[in-house]
Regions:
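Flexible "arm" and connector segments at domain edges
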Residues: 2-76, 80-124
Length: 124
């Protein structure tokens, strides 16, 4: 059995982090409109799903070359915005949880087994 190395990313969030700036602006936008009352975790998760569907719709019945990049940017921004707001609701650091997930995936998908294949980790 091969031993997997645990390569771990170091998290280095500065006060000028793009994620922190985006969250600050999103919360300011939300709070100016008194919308926090509607932004409970359930509804934020539903909004992510709906906006993800709208993003998918940009590709429906088209090749990726025919997709409208302007619309893709808008829908992707919505998905990201609701994701950041949901993370904030739970006090989660978006960059930190992304890096944690990458580390988990490194263990599930070692390069020597997963390179060049789309197989799921339990089929490698």
């Amino acid at each position: 059995m091969m031993k997997l190395s645990r390569k771990v990313f170091k998290l280095n969030l500065s006060q000028n982090s793009i994620m922190k700036n985006a969250i600050t602006e999103l919360k300011k936008f939300r709070d100016e409109r008194d919308w926090d009352q509607f932004h409970n975790p359930k509804d934020l998760a539903i909004a992510i799903s709906i906006e993800s569907g709208e993003l998918l719709e940009e590709f429906l019945w088209k090749s990726h070359h025919d997709a409208n990049i302007g619309n893709i940017k808008k829908e992707l921004a919505d998905v990201l915005a609701y994701s950041l707001l949901l993370a904030d609701k739970y006090g989660l650091d978006p960059e930190g949880i992304i890096l944690e997930k990458i580390n988990e995936n490194r263990l599930k998908y070692p390069v020597e087994k997963s390179k060049g294949t789309a197989k799921k980790y339990d089929q490698l």
